[in-house]
């Protein structure tokens, strides 16, 4: 029997974003894969300066390396989580932490939002409503 795919669902508690992620997870299940999902609550580490943290994380996500990944992680507050194979998130606030966790733990990652400062190429799959890149990982209807 195959081991299940461990999915880390990053959530900032926005119903529409969670619905999008759950739709992707359902699609993976419907394709015949066994999955285990852990929802990880995410917030800003210092809420009163969240606009500054948002700016910092977006700029740092342009150049993912060990230092920028640590800095990005310091800007967020995360629930503890177990080992995962795929990290999935939706909404522009979560793209930098999705990217950082995937790079740090060498996992695949899926994100849904409009493009900002980061590169579509840094995601295993980047789902948008319109084409934002000619890369094959930019998935759209």
Q: Would you name each region that the model predicts?
A:
Residues 9, 14-31, 37-138:
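Active-site and donor-binding regions of nucleotide-sugar-utilizing enzymes
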Residues 2-8:
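Extreme N-terminal starter segment of soluble prokaryotic enzymes
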């Amino acid at each position: 029997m195959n081991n299940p795919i461990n999915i880390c669902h990053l959530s900032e508690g926005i119903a529409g974003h969670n619905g999008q992620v759950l739709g992707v997870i359902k699609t993976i299940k419907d394709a015949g894969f066994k999955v285990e999902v852990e929802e990880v609550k995410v917030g800003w580490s210092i809420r009163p300066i969240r606009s500054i943290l948002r700016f910092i994380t977006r700029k740092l996500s342009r150049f993912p390396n060990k230092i920028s990944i640590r800095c990005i992680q310091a800007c967020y507050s995360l629930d503890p989580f177990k080992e995962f194979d795929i990290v999935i998130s939706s909404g522009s606030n979560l793209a930098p932490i999705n990217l950082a966790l995937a790079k740090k733990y060498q996992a695949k990652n899926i994100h849904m939002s409009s493009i900002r400062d980061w590169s579509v190429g840094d995601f295993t799959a980047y789902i948008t409503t319109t084409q934002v890149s000619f890369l094959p990982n930019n998935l759209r209807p």
